[in-house]
């Protein structure tokens, strides 16, 4: 019996029960499923900051997730994007799971930092450079089997593995992916950087699906900040029309095409908009295996995080979702 107690509790349920503890609300079984945690659009207030740094942090530390993904917007839109605030929030997020936090930027911490309503305004391009230095100048120190990679020149785009499940982040933000309300920077320069980032995202997405065909992969999990379903019209952005267009439609079409070719479960996780919902029809008839999770946050009350059970062998329900503290399941989108 003592020998069995030393066996990792991530083994099948019969052995897990011998380890002396109760199973969490969403259980993790070895090899066939895994459980991850996402958080974002948080904190937007002092109350949410306190909740994240106390109750949420304790719950995350006790749940033994392999990592945490923060899907951006780590501050409220009305807070000035100062070095001090961004550094404090970076430290708070890192402390949720030291050395195991993946973060993709949100519009609140760079594209929207030039708003006239703010007490202190910043160039959005300067804030993006600051974020890249603050969060991504040093790669995470992860085990080799995670196959962790960052995209050259766009280090916020990351890719890693857990067994046969592939994860990646794409730097796509609100404000029409940074194409609207360029108030303090040269618009042509800002749009040129948006175009470069868009191209990098498309390359990173294609590379991830290529990798999934070359290595055993049973599911792909993609995280962005932006709600790709919340675009402006249906017209794609072009060099001759870079702003009065839908900044998400091109990557959305690419994602559906790649997911359809992959055939196995694909989940897009994002924040940016308020509904807490799981969209089983996001891929449409073209890619019924493509799901979309608008995760908890964006003034949802109370402050919480979203845990996801990934069970790729269940084609009808490959993703089971509920909040960490209150076990609230999402509605349909």
In which residue ranges do the predicted regions lie?
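Bacterial N-terminal signal peptides that target proteins for export
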Residues: 2-11
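Bacterial N-terminal signal peptides
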Residues: 10-22
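N-terminal active-site segment of His-dependent metallophosphoesterases
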Residues: 27-85
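Structural recognition of the beta-strand scaffold that forms the well-ordered cores
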Residues: 35-39, 66-76, 100-105, 109-112, ...
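Extracytoplasmic/secreted envelope proteins and their assembly/folding machinery
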Residues: 49-57, 83-91, 128, 132, ...
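His/acidic metal-ligating clusters that form di-metal
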Residues: 58-67, 95, 168, 184-281
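Extended active-site neighborhood of metal-dependent phosphoesterases/phosphodiesterases
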Residues: 80, 85-200, 283-312
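A short C-terminal boundary segment appended to hydrolase-like catalytic domains
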Residues: 311-333
């Amino acid at each position: 019996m003592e020998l069995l107690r030393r066996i990792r509790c991530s083994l099948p349920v019969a052995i897990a029960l011998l380890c002396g503890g109760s199973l969490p609300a969403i259980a993790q079984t070895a090899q066939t499923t895994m459980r991850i945690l996402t958080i974002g659009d948080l904190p937007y207030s002092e109350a949410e900051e306190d909740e994240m740094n106390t109750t949420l942090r304790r719950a995350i530390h006790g749940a033994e997730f392999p990592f945490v993904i923060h899907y951006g917007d780590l501050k409220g839109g009305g807070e000035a994007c100062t070095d001090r605030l961004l550094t404090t929030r970076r430290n708070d997020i890192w402390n949720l799971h030291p050395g195991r936090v993946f973060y993709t930027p949100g519009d609140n911490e760079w594209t929207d930092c030039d708003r006239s309503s703010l007490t202190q305004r910043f160039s959005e391009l300067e804030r993006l450079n600051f974020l890249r230095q603050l969060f991504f100048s040093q790669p995470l120190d992860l085990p080799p089997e995670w196959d962790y990679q960052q995209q050259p020149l766009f280090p916020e785009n990351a890719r890693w593995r857990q067994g046969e499940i592939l994860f990646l982040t794409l730097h796509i933000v609100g404000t029409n992916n940074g194409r609207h309300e360029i108030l303090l920077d040269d618009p042509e320069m800002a749009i040129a950087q948006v175009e470069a980032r868009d191209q990098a995202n498309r390359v990173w997405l294609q590379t991830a699906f290529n990798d999934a065909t070359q290595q055993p992969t049973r599911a792909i999990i993609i995280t962005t900040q932006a709600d790709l379903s919340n675009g402006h019209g249906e017209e794609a952005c072009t060099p001759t029309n870079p702003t009065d267009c839908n900044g998400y439609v091109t990557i959305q079409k690419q994602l559906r095409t790649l997911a359809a070719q992959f055939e196995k479960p694909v989940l897009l996780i994002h924040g940016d908009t308020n509904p807490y919902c799981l969209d089983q029809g996001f891929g449409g008839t073209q890619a019924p295996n493509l799901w979309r999770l608008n995760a908890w946050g964006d003034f949802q009350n109370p402050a919480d995080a979203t845990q996801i059970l990934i069970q790729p062998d269940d084609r009808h329900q490959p993703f089971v979702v509920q909040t960490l503290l209150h076990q609230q399941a999402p509605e349909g989108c």
